[in-house]
Amino acid sequence: MRELKNTCRAAIVQATPVMFDKARSLEKALRLMDEAARNDAELIVFPELFLPGYPYGMTFGFTVGSRKADGRQDWKSYYDNSLLSDGPEMQQLIDRAAALGVYLSMGYSERDAVTGTLYNSNMMIAPDGRAMNHRKLKPTGSERVVWGDAQQDYFPVMDTPWGPMASLICWESYMPLARVALYQKGISLYISPNTNDNPEW
């Protein structure tokens, strides 16, 4: 049986992205990864939807039964700044994690290359280049205007020196059976990125 490391030095990033700007947000993420690694982080965890930011309080012009034109433009801007799970931005994160020798958890808005659907996703990346994507199963409340329900890529478990690692996104951590699904896989590290500072977190 493999001997697991007893401790993990984790850097929990509490920073604001450059909203609706994936290029500048990615630059900031890479700088923060470098800083965390200089401070001996082994695991770096970013918030929910760090790339390209959580559109907190935005309506995207939506009311029940109608949408406004300016809201559609807001949504299009957000869509254009969402990332492909296997796109060049994600590859930059994979490459940087490898160069730094760290594990990474990155919250991002994923754009599906086939369907065009957006997903609230979290990518776990290992220093050997492995990348495992988790899509939020059911967006919370009005998030459903922006992101779709996961049909694949959920509950992946990544092997790490500290044991199996997995993630649930924000409100998913309130779902007992979602947690049970991870516990049944024997996880040692449970990452639950969110985007706010509500008292329950």
Give residue ranges: language-model regions.
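N-terminal active-site segment of His-dependent metallophosphoesterases
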Residues: 1-43
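Cys-nucleophile CN-hydrolase/nitrilase-fold catalytic domain and related Cys-dependent amidase chemistry
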Residues: 22, 34-127, 197-201
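Active-site catalytic loop in hydrolytic enzyme cores
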Residues: 3, 84-85, 89-98, 110-189, ...
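Acidic active-site catalytic centers that drive phospho-/nucleotidyl reactions
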Residues: 14, 48, 172
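Charged active-site motifs of nucleotide-sugar-dependent glycosyltransferases
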Residues: 8-9, 43, 103, 164, ...
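Short, basic, glycine/proline-bearing loop/turn elements
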Residues: 13-20, 72-82, 161-165, 189-195
